[in-house]
């Protein structure tokens, strides 16, 4: 971090300290509050980066509820680094106790002294506002060493420091309309599109499966396994009958599933939104035009499915705004068999088949699975890893082996689903894709084996980290295509 970035972070600390000093009148109390606050934020940010490869961002504060529901599935280990941090924190607390200076004594009454402190707090608003305004400048990178490209939050926070980067990102909690945009022009573009008409008898069922953290890590580098972890899906990707397949570039890595949902359902791109933002939490606060409303117009019944808590990522509210006819969350599932601590893909797909069989109208189902959600280090009685990665120059880890074993469970479940649908006389299309790749700690052995640095990737390597497989399969004749690259 350059000196100007260091100084700008120090300004935040001083403003924070002065506010509580004016309120309490004590340096000890002010320093204790500052130290405890920074310790909590620092530890939280450390574990967030460890688990999802991205720092805490302003809009994460809107996702605390979602994070809390899955936090107990992670292992929070006290590493040597954490122990060092804790020791340093305790040392600073002890030193702060020695600096017990108080606000200058005044002969005025207690009420007057309180008003003076309140006035000083109000005066502090001016430099604080100037500080934030300075960090909000679009051209700040032209005259400082700060990075505001929003290319990767992890790099931006490392370059700028946590609090400076956090405040710089906060300006994107609200987005402005781009130059030249108007509702009238957007509507004129829609009016230019031609519509095709179909009767209900012509419409196939459409099942969209966004499979949690499904990916093919072999795209990252060469390695072998004791057996293929996705033989059936790989056969679909290699050019199967009535199948369109390839790889998809997604906008997220290691988490933020809701953004892949947002892009698929709305057709909008995260490229036009701030890096790290969550549209489900930040921007979808009223009716949202999506593929769902279009399906409704065509005569489809529309169902969203997710075998976990309905409140996660604000789904219950967002799905309603998108116009889904029903949302089946964990409490609505009849098939609840678990793999580890999540509903298995096998059980999830059985639930999909039930919805299809019960539907009298052509069905559009958007299904977000949970089986493969992190973390991958905890042992479970109901999960026996079957896949082991093999390397020549490095060792595999339980994280990678467990992850690949989960991919095999998904592969078996997909084979079951398509086999069942092949025997159905209802025309059905299945769209399948992963929402993102796993975190860095899972795939790091692949990088080590291939002589690559996971923390210093080329553009091509970064693109491979955003790549997941997809296929579109039908139980009737469609034109085949393979090796597509889409986003």
Where does each model-flagged region fall?
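Membrane-interface micro-motifs in multi-pass membrane enzymes
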Residues: 5, 52, 58-61, 74, ...
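Transmembrane and membrane-interface helices of multi-pass
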Residues: 1-153
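Solvent-exposed soluble domains appended to multi-pass membrane proteins
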Residues: 194-200, 210-211, 216-487
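Membrane-interface segments at or immediately adjacent to transmembrane helices
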Residues: 131-208
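Alpha-helical scaffold segments in carbohydrate-active enzymes
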Residues: 125, 149, 156, 232-235, ...
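Membrane-proximal soluble helical/coiled-coil segments
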Residues: 72-75, 80-81, 85-86, 181, ...
């Amino acid at each position: 971090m350059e000196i100007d970035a260091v100084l700008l972070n120090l300004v935040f600390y001083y403003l924070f300290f002065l506010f509580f000093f004016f309120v309490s009148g004590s340096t000890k109390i002010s320093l204790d509050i500052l130290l405890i606050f920074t310790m909590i934020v620092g530890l939280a940010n450390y574990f967030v980066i460890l688990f999802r490869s991205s720092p805490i961002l302003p809009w994460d504060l809107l996702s605390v509820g979602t994070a809390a529901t899955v936090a107990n599935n992670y292992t929070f280990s006290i590493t040597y680094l954490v122990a060092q941090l804790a020791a340093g924190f305790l040392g600073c607390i002890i030193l702060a106790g020695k600096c017990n200076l108080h606000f200058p004594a005044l002969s005025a009454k207690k009420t007057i002294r309180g008003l003076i402190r309140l006035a000083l707090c109000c005066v502090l608003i001016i430099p604080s506002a100037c500080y934030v305004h300075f960090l909000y400048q679009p051209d700040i990178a032209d005259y400082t060493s700060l990075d505001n490209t929003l290319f990767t939050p992890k790099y931006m926070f490392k370059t700028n420091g946590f609090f400076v980067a956090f405040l710089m990102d906060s300006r994107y909690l609200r987005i402005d309309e781009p130059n030249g945009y108007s509702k009238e022009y957007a509507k004129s573009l829609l009016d230019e599109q031609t519509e095709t008409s179909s009767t209900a008898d012509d419409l196939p069922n459409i099942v969209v499966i966004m499979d949690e953290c499904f990916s093919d890590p072999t795209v990252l580098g060469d390695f072998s396994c004791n057996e293929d972890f996705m033989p059936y899906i790989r056969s679909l990707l290699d050019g199967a009958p009535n199948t369109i397949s390839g790889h998809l570039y997604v906008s997220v890595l290691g988490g933020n599933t809701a953004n892949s949902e947002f892009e698929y359902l709305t057709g909008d791109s995260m490229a036009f939104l701030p890096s790290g933002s969550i549209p489900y939490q930040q921007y979808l606060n009223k009716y949202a035009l999506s593929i769902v409303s279009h399906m409704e117009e065509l005569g489809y019944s529309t169902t969203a499915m997710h075998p976990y808590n309905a409140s996660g990522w604000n789904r219950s509210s967002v799905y309603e705004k998108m116009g889904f006819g029903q949302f089946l969350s964990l409490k609505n599932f009849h098939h609840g068999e678990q793999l580890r601590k999540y509903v298995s893909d096998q059980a999830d797909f059985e639930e999909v088949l039930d919805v299809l069989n019960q539907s009298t109208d052509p069905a559009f189902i958007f299904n977000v699975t949970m089986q493969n959600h992190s973390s991958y280090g905890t042992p479970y009685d109901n999960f026996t890893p079957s896949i082991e990665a093999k390397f020549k120059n490095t060792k595999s880890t339980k994280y990678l082996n467990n992850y690949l074993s989960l991919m095999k469970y998904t592969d078996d479940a997909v084979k079951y689903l398509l086999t069942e649908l092949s025997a159905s006389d209802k025309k059905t299309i299945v769209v399948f894709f992963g929402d993102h790749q796993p975190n860095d700690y899972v795939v790091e052995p692949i990088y080590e084996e291939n002589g690559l640095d996971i923390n210093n990737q080329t553009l091509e390597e970064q693109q491979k980290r955003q790549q997941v497989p997809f296929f579109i399969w039908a139980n009737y004749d469609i034109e085949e295509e393979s090796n597509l690259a889409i986003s």
